[in-house]
Structures are given as C-alpha cells and as structure tokens.
A protein has these predicted regions:
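Solvent-exposed soluble domains appended to multi-pass membrane proteins
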Residues: 1-204
C-alpha cells in the first residue's frame, strides 16, 4: 500500500527502524526519537516517560534544542492534530523548549483539521498542510527550523472508515476474525493515503 515511500527510499538515504509498537502508545516512540533515550535503559516501572518522567525533570534534553541554541526559541515548533493534553504533551513540549505546540485545542489551534470519509482523525494531508504553512511563514528567513509532526490518521481503533477501499477485495488472509480483517483493511487503506499524501508533501 506504500509504493511512493518505497520508491523514495530507493533514491535517498533510508533505512529500517524496529518499532516497539504501532497504531497507539506511540508517545513512547516519540520520546525515544526526540531524546535518543531507549526505554530499555530505564526501570520497568517507567511505562510512559511523557507522564511519569519528563514533567518531573528540571531540564530534559531533546534534539530540537540544537536548533533552539543556534537560532533562538522560535526555531522549533511542534504539530499534533489531536488534544494537547494527551500524554501531557502540552507540559512536555514546553520542557523540551519547543516554542509552540499546535493542536486541535491549543490557544492558537491548527488551521487544517479535515478528515477522510468517516475517519474521526485529522488526515495526514491536512497535517502536512499545517506544516507547509509553518515552512512558508519562514521561507524568506535565513534561519533553519525544526518542525516536529506527530500524525493521527492511522491511529487505532480501525473502524470502517474509508469508501472505495480496494484492500477489502484484495485481502485473502485466512484464519482471522472479521474484526481483525476489518482492522487490516482499514489500516492498509490509511497507509495508502499516507503514501500518496507524503509524496504530495515532498513535491511541495
């Protein structure tokens, strides 16, 4: 379902990442990506760093601070098309020294929040457009910027969200429940949308 991304990988620097989860609970993966800290280094009692660790740290490190140190506090911005309090991101991103976290319910909310068909989540196309707006705001500046985007389009649960889902007919999986089959079909179509939307985003 992702031919564009696979093609892009063949023509640029790319690799594989072993993810400890998908579709949900991704705040832990987000924490590891932003800080470089593997959760395996912590005690097993640490389940969600965003809720248990970062709010209690006085000066936690994250990679975006490289930009903050060089270009000033306005050089790093985050976008998450959901609620700001989820996983305490509104607290944690301030700790990480992001200048602003744009969410659906932030004081200055996201402009683009459209969905696809019956999906309850903001589409990746809309999420990318919010990022493009931030890029275009700074296009005449000589300062580099760090933009963090955490999307929601392919988050669980996977209902019957999409019309004209070609993966329903293509699914030949055996020995799975109807619920599992529906999850697979919806996830595959969501990834397919992400694939096209990512290609469109990079073209811009």
């Amino acid at each position: 379902p992702m031919p564009n991304i696979r093609t892009i990988k063949n023509f640029t620097t790319s690799g594989l990442m072993l993810s400890p989860g998908y579709g949900g609970g991704t705040a832990n993966i987000e924490y590891q990506a932003l800080t470089g800290m593997n959760l395996a280094n912590f005690n097993d009692s640490l389940i969600v760093p965003y809720q248990q660790l970062v709010p209690n740290q006085s000066d936690p490190y994250s990679f975006n601070q490289i930009w903050t140190q060089k270009y000033g506090e306005s050089a790093t911005t985050a976008v998450h098309p959901f609620q700001q309090s989820m996983y305490l991101r509104n607290i944690d991103y301030k700790k990480f020294k992001f200048s602003y976290l744009y969410t659906c319910d932030s004081e200055e909310p996201l402009t683009h929040t459209g969905t696809i068909d019956r999906s309850p989540y903001v589409s990746d196309s809309e999420a990318y457009q919010n990022v493009l707006d931030l890029i275009n705001e700074q296009k005449d500046s000589d300062k580099s910027q760090f933009l963090q985007l955490v999307t929601m389009q392919n988050h669980t649960p996977y209902g019957d969200y999409y019309d004209n889902n070609e993966f329903v007919e293509a699914d030949t999986s055996e020995n799975i429940s109807d619920s599992e089959r529906n999850d697979i079909n919806t996830y595959a179509k969501g990834v397919n949308y992400t694939d096209q939307e990512t290609a469109d985003f990079l073209d811009q």
